């Protein structure tokens, strides 16, 4: 019996081991379709997802990414209430119509209204009675010069008989009314005069500014949130569902495990219509196990991340390109999307991940340095940086991610934690939209070279194995770079 023949797979490949072979093309990069899916029931306009990491995704980045056409996954290193509030911020950031606007009663005070406006970052509040009958609206203009904070809202609001309202929530109709009436907020009421929603000119402008945004059926930005296998997991899911989260990501370092599937079944039993993405895995067998037990999406990647040390500390993992392919071969049988998580350094790696079978990619470090990512900037050697840490780092596990690495209960004693990640810094790189533009530009270019009109066609592209010399030849060489491009850095 040979150890090599019996127990060692022939080889595992990652992004730098291959290139895509160019093919005959009838499409230009600007003509290709980059729409895809995140889960069974959630479509994306670009194949990009942000990682559920505490130095990557909170509401600001999730909002920015959804406006570009992707989706963000809010991390869970916070209380249930805090995570639910992050989801709420995303869902309220942009609306065709606000279906559950913040309201106030006529007996509240000017001070109450100002506090509500400040807390929710809004400029107007419908005034309703106990039956939600619209009786007026109060805006920041009504309150701007009020000195008496105890004055009742009824005395300063614009009363219902002077309000312009509508029964038709169509945005084109609402825009016409807003323009003709020279107002900024349009209450939507039913036949009885009961408040149904609120349309603002600001929201209509956002719709026009971000035509590619990833939105739900009500015109709100989509967002997902991470959950783990913890005693309060179902309470967390309940709070997230109450805020209309679009999907939850059941996150673990080893998704091919009994406790993950047990939690998956519990979530699907209570919330059968909620999409649950599960990870991380690295084999086709793991994909089959999760899909058979109800997973609506599977996330691939054990150890490829720049801040992950799992492969070194635990000696476990599969090179990312091979892992994506093996999982995709199984997932395509049931139509479950595959998310390629980790190991990406350049836009060309995104193209390779999609061609190997991924439906979308999850990005961490490339987004951690953006202004929308959590945390402020630091100055080091005269340059701006932002912090970036693996969820398996000691700091992240102390903050709440220990369960992801099956070490729940050890957070209070650092010496008992066995980290599988590090903390680092990444260069500050400006806004997210600039990065996404370059990444999607690279994806479009790669699809054009392969003659792929859409991502499904790209999955038929052929690869060629290359040597280290071939990769060296692929990078700029034999010159000193004097002006770096926005999508390439030799420091990566």
What are these regions (language model features)?
Residues 73-77, 103-104, 124-126, 164-166, ...:
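Catalytic beta/alpha-barrel core
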Residues 28-44, 51-53, 82-122, 127-129, ...:
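Bateman/CBS regulatory modules and CBS-like beta-alpha motifs in cytosolic regions of diverse proteins
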């Amino acid at each position: 019996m040979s150890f090599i023949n019996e127990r060692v797979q022939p080889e595992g490949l990652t992004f730098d081991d291959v290139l895509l072979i160019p093919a005959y093309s009838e499409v230009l990069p600007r003509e290709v379709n980059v729409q895809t899916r995140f889960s069974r029931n959630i479509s994306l306009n670009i194949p990009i997802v942000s990682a559920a990491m505490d130095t990557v995704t909170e509401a600001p980045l999730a909002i920015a990414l959804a406006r570009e056409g992707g989706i963000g996954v809010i991390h869970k290193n916070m209380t249930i209430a805090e995570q639910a509030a992050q989801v709420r911020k995303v869902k309220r950031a942009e609306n065709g119509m606000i279906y559950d606007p913040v309201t106030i009663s006529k007996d509240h005070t000017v001070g109450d209204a100002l506090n509500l406006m400040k807390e929710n970052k809004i400029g107007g509040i419908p005034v309703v009675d106990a039956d939600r009958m619209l009786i007026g609206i109060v805006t920041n203009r009504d309150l701007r010069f009020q000195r008496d904070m105890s004055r009742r809202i009824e005395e300063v609001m614009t009363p219902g008989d002077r309000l312009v309202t509508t029964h038709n929530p169509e945005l084109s109709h609402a825009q016409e009314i807003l323009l003709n009436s020279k107002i900024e907020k349009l209450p939507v009421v039913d036949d009885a005069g009961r408040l149904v929603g609120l349309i603002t000119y600001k929201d209509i402008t956002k719709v026009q500014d971000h035509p590619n945004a990833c939105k739900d059926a009500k015109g709100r930005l989509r967002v997902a949130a991470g959950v783990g296998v913890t005693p309060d997991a179902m309470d967390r899911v309940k709070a997230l569902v109450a805020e209309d989260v679009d999907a939850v990501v059941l996150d673990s370092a080893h998704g091919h495990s009994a406790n993950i599937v047990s939690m998956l079944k519990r979530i699907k039993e209570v919330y059968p219509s909620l999409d649950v993405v599960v990870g991380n895995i690295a084999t086709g067998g793991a994909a089959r196990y999760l899909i058979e037990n109800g997973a609506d999406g599977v996330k691939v990647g054990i150890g490829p991340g720049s801040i992950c040390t799992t492969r070194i500390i635990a000696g476990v993992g599969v090179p990312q390109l091979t892992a994506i392919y093996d999982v995709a071969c199984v997932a395509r049988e049931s139509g479950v999307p595959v998310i390629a998580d980790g190991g990406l350094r350049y836009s060309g790696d995104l193209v390779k991940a999609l061609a190997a079978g991924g439906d979308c990619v999850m990005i961490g470090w490339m987004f951690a340095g953006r202004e929308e990512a959590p945390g402020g900037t630091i100055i080091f050697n005269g340059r701006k940086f932002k912090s970036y840490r693996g969820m398996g780092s000691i700091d992240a596990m102390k903050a709440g991610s220990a369960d992801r690495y099956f070490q729940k209960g050890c957070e209070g004693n650092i010496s008992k934690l066995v980290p599988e990640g590090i903390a680092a810094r990444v260069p500050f790189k400006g806004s997210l939209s600039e990065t996404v533009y370059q990444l999607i530009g690279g994806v479009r270019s790669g699809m054009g070279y392969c003659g792929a009109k859409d991502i499904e066609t790209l999955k038929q592209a052929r690869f060629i194995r290359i040597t280290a010399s071939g990769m060296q030849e692929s990078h700029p060489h034999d010159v000193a770079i004097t002006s770096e491009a926005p999508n390439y850095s030799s420091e990566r």
